[in-house]
């Protein structure tokens, strides 16, 4: 470990996308979908080199002949064989490194079950023979990336949304809340409301198109009712989008109705509180003495917080819920889509962090349980 030139690898495994690269870099080298595809039928063309599984972009492009699986659901790994394939692809195909030569920092969802952390640790040391590894909580890494050690992180990705209060670098588990409403649900909802407008999007290929429409054209309204009125009375909010086949579609109030579901989950038929209320509830579960620090350091993280207008709307909604004298600050770093990875990159390259790695030797002596003693 004394060798300065050995770069650590940082891998952030999200439900939708896997972000991977080298510690010390300011952005991940590889970003690809967290999917594993297996051929639906036995290959007819013998000797055509048909593989028994495909990962990431290759699985995406061959999806017509494959059955696609997402090994990470709602932020938690549910299929370890496929997860191993994703890690293998990350090291050997994307980063082109030998994992036995680099320490590896992995990320995990808040409240990840203990058995899961142990399994990650075991696979890294036993399957990939890494010299050292560490598991960091995603929201905590995002907070580090924003230059803070205290604050509350609203982390919303493709599969799950969490509100995570953090005090002096430690997540407060009793106050973490999870909302099973994230990017994938918003894409599905946009597919549904575009269908109501007369456009049909149903296949997985079409879902990707809708995801692109969502990312390019959707925004969060500051005042939903007022925005609906504006949309009804004029065409100023309408935008057009060209489909791959050249057809041009027009999208109006769908642009802000789609992400409004984050604030009003009832749009999706869910009874849960919206992201603003969930953030407030999380803060209220914390000790009264630290709430002020959380309100003033509310950090947005993850791809689903990338909608224009979301920070202003959060500011407005939380101001309405909080005590009237409270100073509220919503922090929305421009690179927040990758802030978990960036936080991992920063952490793994700190000189003070080097004693925090779990080494192969420690693992051999203590077994997978070592992860609970060294990563918290």
UniProtKB/Swiss-Prot annotation:
The record's subcellular locations are: Cytoplasm, Cytoskeleton
Keywords in alphabetical order, please.
ATP-binding, Cytoplasm, Cytoskeleton, Hydrolase, Nucleotide-binding
Q: Which Pfam families match?
A: Actin (PF00022)
Q: What is its EC number?
A: 3.6.4.-
MF terms (GO), sorted A to Z: ATP binding; hydrolase activity
Q: What class of enzyme is it?
A: hydrolase
**Sequence intervals crossing the membrane:** none
Q: Where is it predominantly found?
A: cytoplasm
Question: Which Gene3D superfamilies does the protein's record reference?
Answer: 3.30.420.40, Actin, Chain A, domain 4
Cystine bridges: none
* Task of the protein: Actins are highly conserved proteins that are involved in various types of cell motility and are ubiquitously expressed in all eukaryotic cells.
Provide the family line: Belongs to the actin family.
Name assigned to this protein: Actin-2
């Amino acid at each position: 470990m004394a060798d300065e030139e050995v770069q650590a690898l940082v891998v952030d495994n999200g439900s939708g996308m896997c972000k991977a690269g080298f510690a010390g870099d300011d952005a991940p080298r590889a970003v690809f979908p967290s999917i594993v595809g297996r051929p639906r039928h036995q290959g007819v063309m013998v000797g055509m080199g048909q593989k028994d599984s495909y990962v990431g972009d290759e699985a995406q492009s061959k999806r017509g002949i494959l059955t696609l699986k997402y090994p990470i659901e709602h932020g938690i790994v549910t299929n370890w064989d496929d997860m191993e394939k994703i890690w293998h692809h990350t090291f050997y195909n994307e980063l082109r490194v030998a994992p036995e030569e680099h320490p590896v920092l992995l990320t995990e969802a808040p409240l990840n079950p203990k058995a899961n952390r142990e399994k990650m640790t075991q696979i890294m040391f036993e399957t990939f023979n890494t010299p050292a590894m560490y598991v960091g909580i995603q929201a905590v890494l995002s907070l580090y990336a924003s230059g803070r050690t205290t604050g509350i992180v609203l982390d919303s990705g493709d599969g799950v949304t969490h509100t995570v209060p953090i005090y002096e670098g430690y997540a407060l588990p009793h106050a973490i809340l999870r909302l099973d409403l994230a990017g994938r649900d918003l894409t599905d909802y946009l597919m549904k409301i575009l269908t109501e407008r007369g456009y049909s999007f149903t296949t997985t290929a079409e879902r990707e198109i809708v995801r692109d429409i969502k990312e390019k054209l959707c925004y969060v309204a500051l005042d939903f009712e007022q925005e609906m009125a504006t949309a009804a009375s004029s065409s100023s909010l309408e935008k057009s989008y060209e489909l791959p086949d050249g057809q041009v579609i027009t999208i109006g109030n769908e642009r802000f109705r789609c992400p409004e579901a984050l604030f009003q989950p009832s749009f999706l038929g869910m009874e849960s509180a919206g992201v603003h209320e969930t953030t407030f509830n999380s803060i209220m579960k914390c000790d009264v003495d630290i709430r002020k620090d959380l309100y003033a350091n509310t950090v947005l993280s993850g791809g689903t917080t990338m909608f224009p207008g979301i920070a202003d709307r959060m500011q407005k909604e939380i101001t309405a819920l909080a005590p009237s004298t409270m100073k509220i600050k919503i922090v929305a770093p421009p690179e927040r889509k990758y802030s978990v990875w960036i936080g991992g990159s920063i952490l793994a390259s700190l000189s003070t962090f080097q004693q925090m790695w779990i080494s192969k030797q420690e693992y051999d002596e203590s077994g997978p349980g070592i992860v609970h003693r060294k990563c918290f």
